């Protein structure tokens, strides 16, 4: 035994010989027997003359498991002390000295590759071995009739365990879905983290009852609190605030350790709630990039208008981001051919070749035809985030302005042909002051548009116009006095600090489902973040970039133990085990 313990033992100083200067000498025993067709079980820790701890165990508990529980409880109560502990169980004795560590090294499997019995109790025992300052676990004979201290202590432990099993009250624990753990102090097991927190709170240990007390209530360990709150949440799927309000209103017989923190984690990690609840995160507004002079940066969009003459039902809108100048062309179809045709025949001859084009992800813009033409011409075509109209805010707002103006003009004139009224709508849009108090026409040409008063009797003064040289000098003055300050103002907006979104590569996120069917969750996923920009994300499984406002963080749900069915040698019996999936 000494050689095996030296080679395979868990604790190097663990011995099977009594420690002379021990603080405590205790005796442990577990009892399991049939009574009226039901298997009862109990465990106890005693001295020679006094019962220190005795508890009933769940019906059906085996004698081996009861012995492990009793020995583990003794080690926990002797934390930081020198302890001699006697047990008449060869199984518990050998597990503590040798077999437990061997099982652990084998992955808690038998030589046949099956999961060992009493897995959780063995792990708890191996962990508790390090709690006492010095430890000796000694095997003694069971059912001794002598009058030695060893015999008296063993008899008292056996009697206390049996009486605890017989006097066990009927099971009145609340039935919780997928969880049959009894939430009673008799089954509370405190971890090192729990004990540290309890000492910080100033809780007291009830040695006779075997649990900690704070504010006059038994303290429920952190793991039990998690299981209870997780079960309650899965029954109701209420949020953190409402669950907290319900718990505050109720009079719980227990003090729940780390209740609010655990409740927040349970609510955040629920995958069902994550797919349905709205996102509370607020993403800071970004800054739109504009051109540094007219004609370099355009935003393009198709907008649908009620059919006019000759079947025109679409409007292709170009907006210069620097000046706000708008060009709009009625079309019968929404195709890439029309986009490239208007770009080459209308925009390029009058304003020069654009450097940047910004659009949404419409079919006419993502088409290979449009992208190939832009690549050949050296145009940087930027596709905005899907379902994020703010990214194309300037052209989207212009669409609304044109439609509202056309509606007013059709009502005022009585005509239903909006194509005929489009030039008037464009004139209004081009001569409406922008954020800096200048109209797009004034930014582009340096002066208001010429207006003729046809009722003026002196028409001769309108016949003379400035020379070409005067026009060129005026345009140079416009570039100097208007364009440069305006470009500087746009640059100042870009230089303003932008609060980045909190998502990083490798994070798990939920993505908003923009078109939901009946009873379909509003979020899909979770997905892993692959790439990020200050305002958008690229995730696995979705080709388009996603704006940060359309995602929310996904909390990794806890791994819940699941039930598994195992065959037994008896064809009329099956074995149910619970463990990690």
From Swiss-Prot:
The UniProt entry, under Pfam families, shows: MLVIN_C, RNase_H, rve, zf-H3C2
For this protein, the record's SUPFAM superfamilies field holds: Ribonuclease H-like (SSF53098)
* EC number per UniProt: 2.7.7.49, 3.1.26.4, 2.7.7.-, 3.1.-.-
Q: Which CDD domains match?
A: RNase_HI_RT_Bel
Q: Which reaction does it catalyse?
A: Endonucleolytic cleavage to 5'-phosphomonoester; DNA(n) + a 2'-deoxyribonucleoside 5'-triphosphate = DNA(n+1) + diphosphate
Q: Where is the RNase H type-1 domain?
A: 20-166
The molecule here is called: Pol polyprotein
Please indicate if the UniProt record lists Nuclease as a keyword.
Answer: yes
Function, as annotated = During replicative cycle of retroviruses, the reverse-transcribed viral DNA is integrated into the host chromosome by the viral integrase enzyme. RNase H activity is associated with the reverse transcriptase.
Q: Spell out the note in the miscellaneous section.
A: This protein is synthesized as a Gag-Pol polyprotein.
* Database matches in InterPro entries: Gag-pol_Znf-H3C2 (IPR039464), Integrase_cat-core (IPR001584), MLVIN_C (IPR040643), RNaseH-like_sf (IPR012337), RNaseH_domain (IPR002156), RNaseH_sf (IPR036397)
Q: Name one GO biological process term.
A: symbiont entry into host cell
Keyword annotations from UniProtKB, A to Z: DNA integration, DNA recombination, Endonuclease, Hydrolase, Multifunctional enzyme, Nuclease, Nucleotidyltransferase, RNA-directed DNA polymerase, Transferase, Viral genome integration, Virus entry into host cell
Q: Which gene encodes it?
A: pol
Family the entry assigns? Belongs to the retroviral Pol polyprotein family.
Record note on modification: Specific enzymatic cleavages in vivo yield mature proteins.
Gene Ontology MF annotations: nucleic acid binding; RNA-directed DNA polymerase activity; RNA-DNA hybrid ribonuclease activity
Which residues belong to any copy of the Integrase catalytic domain? Answer: 290-448
